[in-house]
Amino acid sequence: MEISGSVLRQLSYVSGYGTPTRSRGVASRVGLRMGTGSGFCDEGHLQYYQDTKKILTPKKLKLLKGFSKLGLASDPEKLAMFHDLQQNLTSDAGEVLLRELEAARAKEKEMKKKRKQEIKAKLKASKMNCESSSSSSSESSDSDGDCDQVVDMNCFRAGAGVVVPAPVEESPLPKTPIVEDTNAKAHRDAMALCSKNDISVSSVRDCIKSESAVVTAAPQKRIEVCMGTKCKRSGAAALMQEFERVVGVEGGAVVSCKCMGKCKTAPNVKVQNSVDHSLARGLDDSVNIPANPLCIGVGLGDVDAIVARFLGESHTDIGMIGAATAT
């Protein structure tokens, strides 16, 4: 038993001793092979440089297209550089043309920026100029068409008078005969109906008189203050309060209205002093008062003058007329 144990110990020692010697010999052989060999074991590192060349070639071709747009035909030196670059993409001419291309692109960007700034400035100016005109076109009232004469308050203060348009000949309409014929026909029809149905004639006459009284109404004089965008900014609210103080607020004598389309000379006021043109004369036929004038550029100091000139001494009765019409 002791002999067999010692033999096994010797065999294991011999086997363990041989293993490191074998591995040491392999490592030495590998080291000798790597030390004596010249170059890399494979050519995979060259793929990086080949890929770089493939990427640079399309970029240079793209630059060539950009160079063709620079107008090189007019400059013989640049044209020669361009042909040289087409034949040899790695030549120094490419750097010169590249700088030319970058300068041209920077110049083009600057021109585009200037054009955008000019367009923006024009749009801003047109927006400021047309702010009032756009609102007036959408909010123009029907009373603007009834205005026959425009009064510039600057000329009015200087004593120049009223801007009178060219007279238009109008054929007189037979208003009264038509009304009389209609009333007479209605009266005859009512009498015939009474005779058939045995109705008293006095009751029918009372009905006809009451209907005619309801239709007839006196024209109301009033002052319309424009409340457009520019007129509001120019103090139309304060102007309306001043007119209410001078004229009175009973019966709606001073009212606000939509834009009249004259906002360039704001604030504006329209005086409705008559419905018929024949009523636009004073007590003296030699003094003509404009019918429904539109006063432009009105200030707070012009309120008394407008009331005295276009409404006359009867402006204190405007509220009474409006109240009678409302009832």
Swiss-Prot record:
Q: Where is this region: Disordered?
A: 108-146
Its Gene Ontology biological processes? lipid metabolic process; triglyceride biosynthetic process
Q: Where does [2Fe-2S] cluster bind?
A: C226, C231, C259, C263
- Top-level class of the enzyme under EC nomenclature: transferase
**Organ and tissue specificity:** Expressed at low levels in stems, leaves, flowers, pods and seeds, and barely in roots.
Tell me the domain of life. Eukaryota
Q: What is this protein called?
A: Diacylglycerol O-acyltransferase 3-1
> What is the organism field in this record?
Glycine max (Soybean)
Give me the gene this protein comes from: DGAT3-1
